[in-house]
């Protein structure tokens, strides 16, 4: 688990990122989950842009967290940032 100070640092880093994955009104088909998995494996910290209402976005974020073992770093409007450490690697 990330501490609140670690999340704060990651949120700052995430501000400079562009969304890597866009989740449209079709939701989270397996292909989108695979794309998120791939982006997390490559970059550790990613941004995802959602198209939907607030409740639907919250459900999608929960599903992403469950399926990818990532951690939510922050959410602003329709964009959320996720972080996942690489296997065997620890954050400084």
Please give the residue ranges for each predicted region:
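Positively charged, polar, low-complexity stretches
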Residues: 1-92
């Amino acid at each position: 688990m990330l501490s609140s100070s670690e999340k704060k640092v990651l949120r700052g880093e995430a501000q400079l990122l562009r969304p890597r994955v866009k989740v449209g009104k079709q939701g989270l088909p397996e292909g989108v989950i695979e794309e998120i998995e791939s982006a997390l494996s490559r970059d550790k910290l990613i941004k995802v842009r959602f198209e939907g209402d607030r409740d639907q976005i919250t459900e999608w974020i929960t599903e992403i967290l469950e399926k990818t073992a990532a951690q939510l770093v922050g959410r602003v409007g329709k964009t959320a940032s996720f972080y996942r450490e690489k296997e065997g690697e620890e954050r400084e």
